[in-house]
Amino acid sequence: MIELILSGEGNSDIGEKDIQLQSFIPGPITVLTINILNYFHKFDIKCHFINRMQLKKYPMTLKGKKKREKIKTTGKGHANLAYKLACIARENNYQVAILMRDASKNEFQSIYQEIMGGFETAMYKNGVAAIPVPESEAWLISCLDPNESKSIEGCKTDMKKLLEQKLLKRNQAHNKETWCEIAGKCAIEKVEAPSFNKYRSDLEKVVKYLF
């Protein structure tokens, strides 16, 4: 079994904690991540979650002026969050840490470098940046209609509205349960969205490292 820790933008992408049961309720991007990992290697996966605000409040643990300066100049906050997530993963012996952030097509490379810079500063090898372009709904649309996936990142239509329209045409509910079902059934090998394929490729590298 491998254990992941994930953090994202909001409750509708990575997931949320059930306050009463104190358990993690996976969102569509977590379900999609499990789907991708199992595409490369079948194994049991346990997911842990920390929301954005909790991660922001988590203390920096690097000591020494030079290391603090290195963290500070790595990025616009994304590097700090990636660093903190890596620290949490290491402290709890989680094998993989995944930080998700939406990005425009022009922002993708800089945000990717910031996140990976944070993981590298923490010397954590299995950190992965999940960066849907322009937002997580684009990946779900790509799973729903793989033929549209190659051009989805250049589409100027609101992704949330587009996903809702596509689900209405299929007489499917526009809710988290449906999104998770789409993610779980996604034909990983058919999706051509560049940001999706980068995520898939990075997860494949992690699988090869672990096994």
Give the location of each predicted region.
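Domain-level signal for Mg2+-assisted phosphodiester chemistry and nucleotide/NA-binding surfaces
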Residues: 1-77
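Generic beta-sheet signal
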Residues: 2-4, 70, 95-99, 127
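Acidic beta-strand-to-loop metal/phosphate-binding motif
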Residues: 6-8, 93-106
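Well-ordered, non-membrane alpha-helical segments in soluble/globular domains
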Residues: 24-32, 74-86, 107-118
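Structural alpha-beta junctions
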Residues: 31-46, 92, 117-131
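Acidic carboxylate-rich catalytic motifs and surrounding loops in phosphoryl-/glycosyl-chemistry enzymes
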Residues: 44-57, 131-134, 177-189
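Activity-critical C-terminal alpha-helical subdomain
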Residues: 100-174, 178
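Charged phosphate-binding loop/patch that engages nucleotide di/tri-phosphates or the phosphate backbone
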Residues: 174-211
